[in-house]
């Protein structure tokens, strides 16, 4: 897939926001330059997830930003999202690819070189690797060394996105790893000024990814 689309990857978390406030944040982020959005809301019923996905897709479509659905293949297909992201404990990559078909984007979490190679072989379009730094989004997530991230980038032909505790202040440490982009949750979703924070990320990424 196009590496540029993965440059600044927003992963959502509603925290305590109302639906209206949450959607406003997503809209601001899309307007300000995020290049892809993943809807990741673990605590919703299927219908709640579906309804929220429809609303988010209206926003992402308006800004021509791809929408990725986390975990839920059914919701991805129901709203005709651009793609699906699956983790270690979810559908086998080959099964997800078979159901999605060749046109949808398929992202896969890969914390090791072995998993990265397996995912690539089974049809993944990109990999999400981390947590690079400690994160409150997944409090017990094991840390992936930056050296491991770099090795994964060098080993696979598909793009790799770093994730986990990433902020506009610490992403400089990813210079030279070969990543296609960074996935950000808290530092964007809870920013006081999402537009300014998005621009800060994009400015840093211009140097890191060039």
Curated annotation (Swiss-Prot):
Example GO molecular function: magnesium ion binding
InterPro entries: Aldolase_TIM (IPR013785), ThiamineP_synth_sf (IPR036206), ThiamineP_synth_TenI (IPR022998), TMP_synthase (IPR034291)
Recorded coiled-coil stretches: none
Keyword annotations from UniProtKB, A to Z: Magnesium, Metal-binding, Thiamine biosynthesis, Transferase
Pathway(s): Cofactor biosynthesis; thiamine diphosphate biosynthesis; thiamine phosphate from 4-amino-2-methyl-5-diphosphomethylpyrimidine and 4-methyl-5-(2-phosphoethyl)-thiazole: step 1/1
CDD domains associated with the record: TMP_TenI
Record-level GO BP terms: thiamine biosynthetic process; thiamine diphosphate biosynthetic process
Listed Gene3D superfamilies: Aldolase class I
Cellular compartments per GO CC: cytoplasm
Residues engaged in binding 4-amino-2-methyl-5-(diphosphooxymethyl)pyrimidine: 38-42, 70, 109, 138
Assigned EC number: 2.5.1.3
Residue positions binding Mg(2+): 71, 90
Protein family according to the UniProt entry: Belongs to the thiamine-phosphate synthase family.
PANTHER family for the chain: THIAMINE-PHOSPHATE PYROPHOSPHORYLASE, THIAMINE-PHOSPHATE SYNTHASE
HAMAP family to which the protein is assigned, alphabetical: TMP_synthase
Protein name: Thiamine-phosphate synthase 2
Gene that encodes it: thiE2
């Amino acid at each position: 897939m196009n590496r540029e689309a993965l440059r600044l990857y927003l992963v959502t978390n509603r925290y305590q926001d109302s639906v209206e406030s949450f959607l406003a944040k997503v809209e601001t982020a899309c307007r300000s330059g995020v290049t892809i959005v993943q809807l990741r809301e673990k605590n919703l019923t299927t219908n709640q997830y579906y309804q929220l996905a429809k609303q988010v897709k209206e926003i992402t479509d308006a800004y021509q930003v791809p929408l990725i659905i986390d975990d839920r293949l059914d919701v991805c297909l129901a709203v005709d999202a651009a793609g699906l992201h699956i983790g270690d404990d979810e559908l086998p990559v080959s099964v997800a690819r078979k159901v999605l078909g060749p046109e949808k984007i398929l992202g896969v979490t890969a914390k090791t070189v072995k998993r990265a190679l397996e995912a690539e072989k089974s049809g993944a379009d990109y990999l999400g690797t981390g947590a690079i730094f400690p994160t409150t989004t997944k409090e017990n997530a094991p840390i992936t060394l930056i050296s491991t991230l770099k090795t994964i980038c060098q080993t696979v032909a598909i793009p790799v996105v770093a994730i986990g505790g990433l902020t506009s202040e610490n992403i400089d440490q990813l210079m030279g790893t070969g990543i296609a982009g960074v996935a950000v949750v808290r530092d964007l979703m809870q920013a006081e000024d999402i537009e300014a924070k998005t621009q800060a990320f994009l400015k840093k990424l211009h140097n890191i990814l060039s």
